[in-house]
Amino acid sequence: MSSKRAKTKTTKKRPQRATSNVFAMFDQSQIQEFKEAFNMIDQNRDGFIDKEDLHDMLASMGKNPTDEYLDAMMNEAPGPINFTMFLTMFGEKLNGTDPEDVIRNAFACFDEEAIGTIQEDYLRELLTTMGDRFTDEEVDELYREAPIDKKGNFNYIEFTRILKHGAKDKDD
């Protein structure tokens, strides 16, 4: 049985397939802007962003990045960075959930005693009167699974952990 691919080519790390709906996350003008940015970073024009491309791009901006810094940037991707992977990574950053510390710090702004909790009535008032206002029904839904103690303290540190990692088992 002959293989169409040479075995020597299989040692190269192949890009992981990005979700097919990645292009649906952005409108056409945004995709064009990302393509222009990708092309500016892809200094050697091989269709992939590699460590050397990042180094050259940063050097052209007057930066002198260390190998460790460049490695950390490259390790953000699960494989070689083609345009689809580049778009997927930005989509996750722009449209995905916020990092855990960002969510926690947003709650902490309203925790005057810095103890990791917010009084449930106060939080309800904030959620229904500020920013993108929640309805009472939406707050009720939020509170259904929220970590609220018997005194009515909403534990936002635990809530943030639940948002990012899921609820603990009841057996714990």
Curated annotation (Swiss-Prot):
The keyword Metal-binding applies. PROSITE patterns: EF_HAND_1, EF_HAND_2. One of its GO terms (molecular function) is myosin heavy chain binding. Residues 29-64, 98-133, 134-169 form the EF-hand domain. Pfam families: EF-hand_7. InterPro entries: EF-hand-dom_pair (IPR011992), EF_Hand_1_Ca_BS (IPR018247), EF_hand_dom (IPR002048), Myosin_RLC (IPR050403). Ca(2+) binds at residues 42, 44, 46, 53. Residues 1-20 are annotated as: Disordered. It comes from the Eukaryota. Phosphorylation increases the actin-activated myosin ATPase activity and thereby regulates the contractile activity. The modification Phosphothreonine is found at residue 19. The modification Phosphoserine is found at residue 20. Signal peptide: none annotated. GO terms for cellular component: cytoplasm; myosin II complex. Myosin is a hexamer of 2 heavy chains and 4 light chains. This chain binds calcium. Myosin regulatory subunit that plays an important role in regulation of both smooth muscle and nonmuscle cell contractile activity via its phosphorylation. Implicated in cytokinesis, receptor capping, and cell locomotion. This is Myosin regulatory light chain RLC-A. It comes from Rattus norvegicus (Rat). The gene is Rlc-a.
